[in-house]
Amino acid sequence: KYPDVQRESAPVYRGQHVLKRDEAGAERCTACGLCAVACPAEAITMESAERKKGEENLFREEKYASIYEINMLRCIFCGLCEEACPKEAIFLTDRIVPSSFTRGEEVFGKDKLVESTENPIDVTKRQRQEVIDFKKDKRHYHNRTFLDAKPIAKNHH
């Protein structure tokens, strides 16, 4: 049957990582580093940069990951990176991670991680509802963007 018919993976299967884009096609990752801190294998590294004028359509917020790498030889596919991410930027998909013959090809950069705008990846089927609800709750400061910001009212005593 294989390769014509592939086996169905378990609902909790954790495979290829993806860096998601928002509805407008901008990258969600703000290089906050929480995924790297949460990673017990220390497989995630990144460098942040400031968004320049004219790049608003590319990056959702003022800070973004100019370099984002996952060392797939170190990754244990625990999923703590996606749980730690406050911006719903990184997810583990149901796709099998491709292998290679050299160590250098096992360090996945943004070229392999950022989802394409033409072929978005549905990651909702792997998520627990309580995680989805928590991440969408705008009362949590880390889920807000500059679009949600309200002016601070001044108290006149």
Regions inferred by a protein language model and the residue ranges of each:
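Ferredoxin-type iron-sulfur electron-transfer modules and their immediate structural context
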Residues: K1-E50, K112-R144, K154-H157
